[in-house]
Amino acid sequence: MRIDLQKVAEKLLLVLFLSSSLFFVLEIALRAYSYELAGMIIFTAMFCAGMVALAFVSAKLEKTVSIPVAALLIFFLYAASVSMFFNSIVLSLFLLSFPFAWLRFVEKKTFNESLQLLMATRKGFLWNALLGFCLTLFLFYPIMFLEVVILKLVGITDVSNVSEIIRKAPLWLAVFSFTVAPVAEEFFFRGFLLPRIGIVASAVLFGLAHYAYSSVAEFLGAFTIGLLLGILLLRTRNIVSVIVAHITFNLISILIIYLGSWFG
């Protein structure tokens, strides 16, 4: 029996979108629960909304989607209770799947049309991958290094916040940050947002998304790399180039941090 890989990918992305969305609804509800009466009301409302949404999914979609959604949601909730870092994983899965869900349900696009709109194509794959790797290694990273030097000269030195968080994080999160996370972020910020709100606005949002480290240097760094990746995507019209560039950038950064902690 021949397996339709596009159908499998489409269903997998739908499962990821629904389960990650429901996870954050319930996560916010649980956080609100601690805020006395108002929090309990919000918790009840959001919990009920999440359960209604899950029931809707079960009723409207076939079992090949609804059952995995419920199972994955339970796993997400359990994993998040075990590790405080797991929310980052679910967020990346949401960012990856959201563009496809939006294009399917709001803009009524087929999966192939969605891939084209997100500039995901196999044409020139190796060339774009090599371009993204080389540009990051010989242009983007030197630019970012120069930016860090300038920031230190003007008194912005909180870049160490990021290094400390990464050192304390489990190894699997570091691996995730240069494998899955760059793919998710490029599909969302460059493939989906950039054509809709422009290169500068998408770079600002990309920077704000990295401000969770409470680091001005990290925000400015993410904003700059967001601009560089945006320019690269507009030139190549192929998301492979920016995904590989982002993977390369994150991998180099993590290696520098770990090598610094081992030999520093």
Predicted feature locations:
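Alpha-helical transmembrane segments in multi-pass membrane proteins
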Residues: 31-109
